């Protein structure tokens, strides 16, 4: 039995451009669909005559669906191809979002948003794996940072469209029109079908697999099981804890920071808006900076430095979160705490690249998709946990938000323990069966 290394063929500049543009748009649409819902919740509640708890549960169901979608489309990405899985995920995503606009009751909306979540969950992993398999290994970090940095575009678009739709149209139609904009992934599907190539590394691997000329760990079982077997078991457990800790901290702070500033610390709405705009700019620059640094110093560095910024944020939140706005942003402690938080967020820029480099090609799509979406699923619990903890401390929202501190420590610990992979080839390295030649 011999070991064969199958190198991915080169990609043209046009092909690489199509890949990164589609991934940036895909991630932006993914996050846009999640972030626009808070702007629509009030209108949906009144239009359908449902409770706030019910409309809030719709977002939770969407995130639960995304965990299932991550596993499903990750599996398909390893079996039918990265591009095909991405197209199928976008189709379900778009169909669910468009259909949601015509929901007539709580249950119809809940089911359709759950379906939307399944499609949404498959988009990120399939696109991110294809990107990393096609991109220059020396610049994967900065490329991944550009993709994740499109979150800034998503947040801005969600706020603009959400406010525009609910204020420009009737109560019955405003939220429906906003949800219809989620059908834009159909346009991205057409773009992908026309311009974006399939992963050449996967095509070569699949050709050998179909000929029976290659042996992989996933050949004897499904890819979701294979990622938890043998030497991948401890790695997968660490990756899950790593991603879950990140998402719990992210949602535990980002959901409540505007409320903390405005209602608890007496910051006027325009000051909260200005701080959010400044934070978005700093966050975008941080993504790009960390992307360049993790290409130079390693994936661990690209996650560790932002994680330490989060640690500073947690300590400062504990010490200074009681200091109210006194007329100056620069003398408002929560402003600097928020900047420390958004700098820490840039750890997400290394996630897709690090996970893609950690896992072998036969389980890569499944592992990357499932781990990311499982993390997001756990992160969705933070908006429930924070108020509960706040209640234990006399209703102090800031005290409730400090519940993210253990998650930060777990994130830092897993960052130190995970293997460094900078510069790793994502071509296939697998055992091939010997070929018998007739005499």
Label the model's feature ranges.
Residues 68-104:
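Conserved MFS/SLC helix-loop-helix module at the cytosolic interface between two early adjacent transmembrane helices
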Residues 49, 81, 102-108, 136, ...:
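Helix-breaking motifs and short loop linkers at transmembrane-helix boundaries and internal kinks
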Residues 141-166, 185, 372-383:
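Glycine-rich segments within core transmembrane alpha-helices of 12-TM secondary carriers
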Residues 1-32:
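Cytosolic juxtamembrane N-terminal segment immediately preceding the first transmembrane helix
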Residues 37-38, 231-284, 383:
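Extracytoplasmic gate region of multi-pass secondary transporters
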Residues 91-104, 309-326:
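C-terminal ends and interior cores of transmembrane alpha-helices
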Residues 112-149:
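Cytoplasmic helix-loop-helix junction between adjacent transmembrane helices
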Residues 79-90, 296-308:
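Cytoplasmic membrane-interface "Motif A"-like loop-to-helix N-cap segments
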């Amino acid at each position: 039995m011999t070991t064969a290394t199958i190198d991915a063929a080169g990609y043209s500049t046009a092909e690489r451009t199509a890949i990164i543009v589609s991934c940036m748009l895909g991630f932006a649409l993914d996050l846009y669909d999640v972030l626009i819902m808070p702007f629509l919740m009030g209108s949906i509640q009144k239009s359908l005559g449902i409770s706030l708890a019910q409309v809030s549960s719709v977002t939770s169901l969407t995130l639960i669906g995304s965990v299932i979608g991550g596993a499903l489309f990750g599996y398909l990405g390893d079996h039918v191809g990265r591009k095909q899985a991405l197209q199928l995920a976008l189709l379900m995503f778009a169909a669910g979002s468009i259909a949601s606009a015509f929901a007539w009751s709580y249950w119809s909306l809940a089911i359709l948003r759950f379906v939307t979540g399944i499609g949404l969950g498959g988009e990120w992993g399939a696109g991110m794996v294809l990107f990393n398999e096609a991109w220059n290994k020396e610049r994967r970090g900065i490329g991944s940072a550009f993709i994740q940095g499109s979150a800034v575009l998503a947040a801005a678009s969600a706020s603009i469209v959400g406010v525009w739709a609910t204020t420009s149209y009737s109560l019955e139609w405003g939220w429906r029109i906003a949800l219809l904009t989620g059908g834009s992934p159909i346009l991205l599907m057409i773009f992908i079908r026309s311009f974006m190539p399939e992963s050449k590394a996967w095509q070569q691997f699949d050709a050998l697999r179909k000929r029976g000329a290659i042996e992989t760990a996933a050949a004897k079982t499904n890819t979701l099981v294979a990622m938890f077997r043998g030497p991948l078991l401890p790695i997968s457990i660490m990756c899950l804890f790593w991603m879950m800790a990140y998402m719990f901290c992210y949602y535990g702070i980002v959901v409540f920071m505007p409320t903390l500033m405005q209602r608890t610390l007496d910051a006027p709405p325009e000051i909260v808006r200005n701080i959010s705009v400044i934070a978005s700019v700093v966050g975008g620059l941080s993504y790009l900076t960390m992307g360049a640094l993790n290409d130079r110093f390693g994936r661990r560095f690209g996650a560790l430095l932002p994680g330490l910024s989060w640690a500073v944020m947690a300590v400062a939140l504990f010490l200074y979160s009681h200091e109210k706005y006194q007329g100056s942003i620069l003398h408002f402690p929560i402003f600097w705490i928020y900047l420390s938080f958004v700098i820490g967020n840039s750890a997400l820029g290394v996630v897709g690249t690090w996970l893609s480099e950690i896992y072998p090609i036969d389980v890569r799509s499944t592992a990357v998709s499932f781990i990311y979406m499982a993390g997001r699923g756990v992160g969705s619990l933070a908006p429930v946990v924070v108020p509960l903890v706040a209640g234990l401390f006399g209703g102090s929202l800031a005290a409730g938000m400090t519940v993210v501190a253990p998650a930060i420590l777990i994130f830092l610990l897993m960052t130190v323990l995970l293997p460094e992979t900078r510069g790793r080839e994502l071509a296939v390295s697998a055992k091939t069966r010997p070929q018998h030649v007739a005499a």
